[in-house]
Amino acid sequence: SARAITDILVMKENEFSNIVLSAVTGVSTEISLFRSLYPMDINNDGITEIPSPVPLPTWDDEKESYQRIDWRSYGIDGGATTVLSTYHNLEDGWYFRLPESWNEQILVSGGAGMEESSVTFFARGEDGLSAESVLRITAITGANRENRAVWGARFGLKRQVDTIYVAELL
């Protein structure tokens, strides 16, 4: 699988320095799975953060692997701090900012049907084995999308020309 290698350059004493360069290998220590995500200011603090995929636990029968993205900020010494974690659905074009308390406690499952694609978030039980569904985000397309967007307890998140994004608390 493809990898992303990131160099982080800072100006120290009027010279550029790569703060994530390994003195042993001469290669960046910032190597992660490539997920079509690029460094950006994800939390609008004026500092560019680096995306770092972290595998999420999977269901026993789930074939697809899911990842949260930890967005890391770097100090001039090369030390990294996670400033935000997100879940990205690149196929449907959305992302969700994960509450900090969810980072090690969620499972994710995806599903697609006729003109709907959804991701369900589950909170892992205290026993570590059980899980309870807490949130579903769905992208709805097709001629009947307006009606399907208000089914049950769904509420709107965003509308585009051909897609309506909704969520429901479970």
Regions found by a protein language model. Name each.
Residues 18-25, 82-87:
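Beta-propeller fold detector
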Residues 24-38:
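Repeat-based blade/solenoid architectures
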Residues 1-10, 14, 99-109:
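Loop/turn-rich, solvent-exposed surfaces of beta-rich toroidal or solenoidal domains
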Residues 99-156:
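Secretory pathway targeting signatures of secreted, lumenal, and periplasmic proteins
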Residues 2-13, 56-80:
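Structural motif
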Residues 84-107:
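N-terminal "mature-domain start" segment
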Residues 9-21, 141, 147-170:
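Short, well-structured beta-strand
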Residues 1-2, 41-54:
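Acidic/hydrophobic-patterned starts of short beta strands in beta-sheet-rich repeat architectures
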